[in-house]
Amino acid sequence: MKYDTRISGWGECALEFLNEDCNFLIIFNETAPQELADISVLHTVAMLQEEPCVGDTVQICDVSYTITAIGFEALHTLKELGHCCLSFSGSTQALRPGNIELKGPVFTENHLYKADGFKS
């Protein structure tokens, strides 16, 4: 397991990005400042054991996704802050520097209500 953490909550605006136009989640360690916590899915602090790579499987709330691209800032901020943007676009190029692009089933807020964690 390269990164194993548990969802501990989410901010009141975090789920607004799970729409057809955006289709992403912003994640942060639960130590995020309040202004960032309001727009983020928060998770327990965990050590990045090994960098995730294109082709790896990411499991979010018991739903599996394949990493299709990683932005040039994503691994640094994931390691330092537990932060990145998980984009469900399936794009083979990162749409933003902090994105990890994922391919798989549609992710909805209902998955978060059954949250059991985030694993890669």
Give the role of each language-model region:
Residues E50-C53, V58-Q59, N110-L112:
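Short, well-ordered loop/turn sites that connect or cap secondary structure elements
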Residues M1-N23:
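N-terminal, charge-rich interaction modules
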Residues N23-V41, C85-N99:
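Short, basic/aromatic beta-hairpin or loop at an interaction surface
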Residues F28-E30, L42-M47, K103-V106:
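A structural micro-motif recognizing beta-strand termini
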Residues S64-E73:
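Short beta-strand-centered aromatic/proline hotspots
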Residues G90-S120:
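Helix-rich interaction surfaces within compact, conserved domain-sized segments
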Residues A74-C85:
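Short, solvent-exposed secondary-structure boundary/capping segments
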Residues C61-D62, G117:
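Conserved "cap/hinge" positions at secondary-structure junctions
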